Swiss-Prot record:
Its main location: cytoplasm. GO terms for molecular function: aspartic-type endopeptidase activity. Keywords: Aspartyl protease, Cytoplasm, Hydrolase, Protease, Protein transport, Transport. Residues 364-402 form the UBA domain. It comes from Aspergillus oryzae (strain ATCC 42149 / RIB 40). The active site is at 204. Residues 1-57 form the Ubiquitin-like domain. SUPFAM superfamilies: Acid proteases, UBA-like, Ubiquitin-like. It is found in: Cytoplasm. This is DNA damage-inducible protein 1.
């Protein structure tokens, strides 16, 4: 017996059409009607659940002379009519670990509520209401601007809307085609020894001089060699106090013992920073292909992310965040995206002035994958965008849309 035949039997007993039935077995949604019960692992005596999805009825059309409903209410009704049932989404999240992890990354609030059906429904509907309200506000703003398009102030606002749309589209394209650019890049550290004291040095070709913290200079027993005549104030993004300069000390890099000078400066969270003076003096090469600092044909591998002490990365853990498009939070210093409320493949509300409708798009992904997503209540365009963002992975695309 196939799942399709089982739905027909349920229809004969309950008068519920197969299109409204969601068969659930072991918290997993049976989406392929062509599979047999044996193929999905259902045996005699097993209990199945049937979840019935009911669509919200459309609001009656008002007469031309009567008052119209608020735009936010209309948007909410449209979303309720086209969006999937919250319980269906919840069961799909619980039944697939990959989808659950994708939702946890993109919508933590919704993922945390997945274990409670009522709480999940409340969170889901609240998010839908917020999105409908924002969309209504955008539509009202566009209508106001289009009412007087020749007003110079309106022209500036329309130009800003177009610019913001271009920025959002650029962000979505980058996240779809170059997602690696939004990851956090590990800084370049190498293990060194200064006067017999082992430490990790930060390689920075953008620094003019090699810098050491006072605590590190004390640990290396070279604080007594600091020439205070070279003290002063360093000015850049902020200010830092320069205590002085150690003109020459021995540093071990790999198996080489090299002379090096250090500028002792306060206010740095890094013990030792190898600057351009040291790198040029010894003709060092930062070889990113090999992942090593090459000096005199000897390659010293950079430390991996797991090998870098946590206190050296604390400055980036608490970095300020900048609000991006669609709720993205971007690190102000590293540029890493730490939270994305809505995936790049999800539906986004357009704020541009209305234009002619685009022709129907063809997709390079299987029609079966598109059909499975549209069965959950999403449109074909949303399904294609989500599949593009997930590189064809069905579960990942559903995770983007939820």
């Amino acid at each position: 017996m196939t799942v399709e035949l089982l739905k027909a039997i349920v229809e004969s007993e309950t008068s519920v059409p197969p299109s409204a039935q969601r068969i659930v077995y072991n918290n997993q949604l049976l989406g392929d009607d062509a599979r047999t019960l044996e193929q999905v692992g259902i045996g005699e005596g097993d209990m199945l659940g049937v979840h019935v999805t009911l669509r919200s009825p459309q609001a009656p059309t008002r007469t031309a002379g009567g008052p119209s409903a608020p735009a936010a209410q209309q948007n909410l009704q449209r979303r309720q009519a086209m969006n999937p049932d919250p319980e269906t989404i919840r069961l799909h999240i619980l039944g697939d670990p990959r989808v659950r992890e994708a939702v946890r990354r993109q919508n933590p609030e919704l993922a945390d509520a997945a274990s409670d059906a009522q709480r999940f429904r409340d969170v889901f509907l609240n998010q839908q209401r917020r999105e409908a309200q924002l969309e209504a506000e955008k539509e009202a703003r566009i209508a106001m601007l289009n009412a007087d398009p020749f007003n110079p102030e309106n022209q500036r606002q329309i130009e800003e809307i177009i610019r913001q749309n271009a920025v959002t589209e650029n962000l979505h394209n980058a996240m779809e085609h170059h997602p690696e650019s939004f990851g956090r890049v590990t800084m370049l550290y190498i293990p060194v020894e200064v006067n017999g004291h082992k430490l990790n040095a930060f390689v920075d070709s953008g620094a003019q001089v090699t810098i050491m913290s006072p605590e590190c200079a004390t640990a290396c027993n070279i604080m007594r060699l600091v020439d205070q005549r070279y003290g002063g104030i360093a000015k850049g993004v902020g200010t830092a106090n320069i205590l002085g300069r150690v003109h020459s000390a021995q540093i071990k890099i790999g198996s080489m013992f090299l002379p090096c000078s250090f500028t002792v400066m306060e206010g740095k969270h890094i013990d030792l920073l190898l600057g351009l003076d040291m790198l040029r003096r010894h003709q060092a090469c930062i070889d990113l292909r090999r992942g090593a600092l090459v000096i005199q044909d000897q390659a010293v591998p950079f430390l991996g992310e797991a090998d870098i002490p946590k206190h050296l990365q604390d400055g980036f853990e608490d970095e300020p965040l900048v609000k991006g498009a669609d709720g993205a939070e971007v690190g102000a210093r590293t540029g890493a995206v730490t939270h994305q409320a809505q995936g790049p493949g999800g539906a986004s509300s357009s704020t541009a002035p209305p234009s002619r409708p685009a022709p129907a798009q063809s997709s390079r992904w299987p029609q079966d994958s598109i059909a499975k997503i549209t069965e959950l209540g999403f449109t074909r365009e949303e399904a294609m965008r989500a599949l593009d963002a997930a590189n064809g992975d069905l579960d990942g695309a559903i995770g983007f849309l939820i």
